[in-house]
């Protein structure tokens, strides 16, 4: 299959296995959920009554004081006591096989092509790290909500895009399922398309 280059009167031959496969919604959902889960820190921690610092001594005698009976100062009903069901550090990560991850990315790219959300250009960049210059270039192409994918990190482009709302710049190694579906359009250079094909096999 072919992808038409927007800035040139030509087309790029690409693999149908990468850019023309059926959309597997269940797989994409599983991979996106796993990606989000793997980003969670899960480092919260509270102490149970067994872990709280304090004496194990009975605070006062059982009878005769007129106060409610108490056996410990570390109980959950005491100020500074332990938490009944204390939250502990958790690992929320979900395992995703390489084959599944690549399959999800192929599904997403194929769906982007079908929905005319994937824009392929011969090259894309700015001469200086100027937001104004990049904004003008994107306005010319009628792009606002866009992810720009380049073969390697372009520092000028990255710095120019940093202050633009709903514009992000990634190299091929930095793309992920969440960022690909989060933007309305995905702008990719021809060289980046070749690298994506190699990466996804």
From Swiss-Prot:
Name one molecular function that GO assigns to this entry: structural constituent of ribosome
List the SUPFAM superfamilies: Ribosomal protein L4
User: Domain of life of the organism in this record?
Assistant: Bacteria
Provide a GO biological process annotation: translation
Question: What GO cellular component entries does it have?
Answer: ribonucleoprotein complex; ribosome
Q: Where is the signal peptide?
A: none
- Name a Pfam family for this protein: Ribosomal_L4
The cross-references to InterPro entries, in alphabetical order and at most eight, read: Ribosomal_uL4 (IPR002136), Ribosomal_uL4-like (IPR013005), Ribosomal_uL4_dom_sf (IPR023574)
The annotated subunit structure for this chain is:
Part of the 50S ribosomal subunit.
Q: PANTHER family, from UniProt?
A: 50S RIBOSOMAL PROTEIN L4 (PTHR10746), LARGE RIBOSOMAL SUBUNIT PROTEIN UL4M (PTHR10746:SF6)
Protein name, as recorded: Large ribosomal subunit protein uL4
User: Species name for this entry?
Assistant: Shewanella pealeana (strain ATCC 700345 / ANG-SQ1)
């Amino acid at each position: 299959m072919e992808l038409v280059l927007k800035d040139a009167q030509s087309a790029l031959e690409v693999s149908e296995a990468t850019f023309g496969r059926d959309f597997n919604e269940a797989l994409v959902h599983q991979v996106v959920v796993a990606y989000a889960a793997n980003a969670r820190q899960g480092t919260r921690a509270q102490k149970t009554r067994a872990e709280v610092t304090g004496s194990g001594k009975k605070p006062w005698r059982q009878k005769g004081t007129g106060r409610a009976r108490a056996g410990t100062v570390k109980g959950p009903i005491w100020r500074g006591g332990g938490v009944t069901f204390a939250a502990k550090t958790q690992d929320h990560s979900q395992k995703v096989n390489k084959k599944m991850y690549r399959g999800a990315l192929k599904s997403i790219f194929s769906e982007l092509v079908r929905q005319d959300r994937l824009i392929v250009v011969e090259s894309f960049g700015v001469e200086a790290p100027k937001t104004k210059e990049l904004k003008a270039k994107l306005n010319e192409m009628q792009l606002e909500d866009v992810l720009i994918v380049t073969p390697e990190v372009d520092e000028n482009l990255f710095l120019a895009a940093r202050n633009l709302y709903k514009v992000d710049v990634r190299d091929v190694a930095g793309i992920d399922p969440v960022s690909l579906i989060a933007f309305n359009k995905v702008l990719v250079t021809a060289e980046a398309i070749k690298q994506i094909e190699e990466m996804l096999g």
